From Swiss-Prot:
Keyword flag Transmembrane helix: yes
Protein name: Protein PsbN
Domain of life from the UniProt record: Bacteria
Main subcellular location: membrane
Length: 43
C-alpha cells in the first residue's frame, strides 16, 4: 500500500514539474526566443 502511494506521488510530482516547465517556457523569459512560423511565412 505504501509503495503504491509513493508511486502515485512520484508520478504526480513529475507531471506537475513538466507542466510548470512548459508554462515557464511558453510565458516566461524564454518565450522571447520562440518563433511563430505563421508570422515568418508571408503570403
Amino acid at each position: 500500500m505504501e509503495s503504491t502511494l509513493s508511486l502515485v506521488v512520484a508520478i504526480a510530482a513529475i507531471t506537475i514539474c513538466i507542466t510548470a516547465f512548459a508554462i515557464y517556457t511558453a510565458f516566461g523569459p524564454p518565450s522571447k526566443n520562440l518563433q511563430d512560423p505563421y508570422e515568418m511565412h508571408e503570403d
